[in-house]
Regions:
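Charged helix-capping and loop-helix junction motifs
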Residues: 46-52, 81-86
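Short, glycine/polar-rich helix-capping loops at beta-to-alpha or helix-loop-helix junctions
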Residues: 125-130
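Surface-exposed amphipathic alpha-helical tracts and adjacent flexible/coil segments at the periphery
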Residues: 1-26, 30-42, 56-57, 63-73, ...
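Well-ordered mid-protein domain cores that form the structural environment of catalytic cofactors
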Residues: 83-119
Length: 420
């Protein structure tokens, strides 16, 4: 039977309300997020609490989006009570599934009837392990160290042996398709704990691997020459140019990494990958389109790109710089004051940096999400102007509704930012 768009999911990372709105705008099929302390981004994207579960589930239901709650850290005995409280709250709120890495979480989800998906932290690398865990889960994230030939073997085994999850349906394969990669196997790293007493496996990673390092011989004190000081900081994963191979290997849920990244990242990446799947199904997955997606993906946060291990292991794929290599950088301009719905015009107070007609702009907000546009006209005191300076109120047409206190940014090149 020919596959349809409904057979696939683009799963968006949500670490803030702005990112949730951006995921909806971009057409995400599902979102994943964490609350409290038992998730792998507890330190870097800790904006939601247990009290937000019902609202998040309701928002997702209204937009026909599945909601996945991550409870994927190591669980100690002292965590059991909190874990059960969170799982029960997720069940009561109507969260679609819990993403788990600990059998205690899986077992309790099964006990109370909460759907569970398995995290990459489990490092599932073969069909026999998948068979074991299928008693708990309907969707499995395979180890990100696998190549696509290995993924295809697991997919074929699921089909041939009819391996089913608790719902009685064939287990679906989920894989990371884009975003940050950890230098450790399936993200199980102990460097942050060793150096900073902050465990990555408890959601408190301090990103020690992203720093620059020098290599010295301890006996001679001679520094060894290395071509790159970021020797533990991998480039970001990008699979959009071989999405056809991912699909044919059996991947059905495409997970985007990035709960600590901004709403502009979420909207851009989700739109690109959603378009890639649609193009594959329509037979228009062309080199020209790949180039277009590449250019868009470069504009938002990235550390450079590589294929991961999916097409076979490659060495030397390390970041060249600290932080982002995005071709566009955000510069804060000001905040939203008012939206005139009858004419589609927004008013902003310019607080931090001047802007001019023709600048590429970005508006973000908890309900607005991420809106990109380039104004061809701007007015101050109802008069057309080319440049708007700090302290002035400016109005211009916007493509979507905005809200008071939304943030206005202009997008500039790294070189332009450096020259200021």
């Amino acid at each position: 039977m020919k596959a349809s768009i409904k057979d696939f999911e683009i799963m968006a990372p949500v670490g803030s309300r702005e990112s949730l709105a951006a995921a909806i705008q971009a057409g995400a099929d599902s979102i994943y997020f964490g609350i409290e302390s038992l998730n792998m981004r507890a330190r870097s994207a800790n904006t939601f609490t247990i009290n937000d579960l019902r609202e998040i589930a309701q928002i997702c239901d209204e937009h026909a989006i599945k909601s996945y709650l991550t409870i994927n850290t190591i669980i100690y005995d002292e965590d059991i009570a909190l874990m059960r409280t969170i799982v029960e709250a997720a069940k009561e709120a109507g969260i679609s599934a819990v993403i788990a890495a600990d059998v205690a979480v899986m077992a309790y989800c099964n006990e109370i009837g909460q759907e569970v998906h398995l995290s990459t932290q489990l490092n599932i690398s073969n069909a026999e392990v998948l068979k074991f865990y299928a008693r708990f889960a309907d969707v499995v994230v395979l180890a990100r160290e696998l190549n696509l030939k290995q993924v295809k073997v697991i997919y074929d085994t699921i089909q041939n042996e009819q391996i089913k999850g608790p719902k009685g349906e064939l287990v679906r394969i989920e894989m990371f398709c884009h975003g940050a990669l950890c230098m450790a196997v399936s993200g199980k790293c102990y460097l942050s704990l060793h150096e900073m007493n902050a465990s990555a496996n408890r959601g408190a990673c301090m990103q020690i691997c992203r720093r620059a390092y020098e290599v010295k011989d301890k006996e001679s004190d001679i520094e060894l020459e290395v071509d790159n000081k970021y020797i533990m900081s991998p480039k970001d994963l990008k699979t959009i140019h071989f999405m056809d191979e991912m699909i044919e290997a059996g991947v059905r849920v495409f997970k985007i990494e990035g709960r600590a990244r901004g709403p502009e990242y979420v909207r851009t990446v989700v739109e690109c990958y959603k378009d890639a799947i649609r193009s594959y199904l329509e037979g228009t997955f062309t080199e020209e389109k790949k180039l277009g997606w590449d250019e868009r993906l470069k504009t938002v946060f990235n550390r450079g790109f590589w294929n991961g291990y999916y097409l076979g292991q490659r060495l030397g794929e390390w970041s060249r710089n600290y932080g982002s290599e995005a071709t566009e950088r955000k510069v804060y301009v000001g905040k939203g004051i008012k939206y005139f719905s009858n004419i589609g015009v927004a008013e902003f107070l310019v607080e931090a940096a001047e802007m001019k007609v023709g600048d590429k702009l970005l508006i973000t907000g908890p309900t607005t999400g991420a809106v990109f546009f380039t104004p061809d006209e701007a007015r101050v005191d109802l008069k057309p102007v080319d440049v708007v300076r700090k302290g002035q109120h400016v109005s211009f047409k916007v493509p979507e509704k905005i809200r008071p206190s939304d943030k206005l940014y202009k997008l500039v090149s790294p070189q332009e930012l450096k020259n200021k």
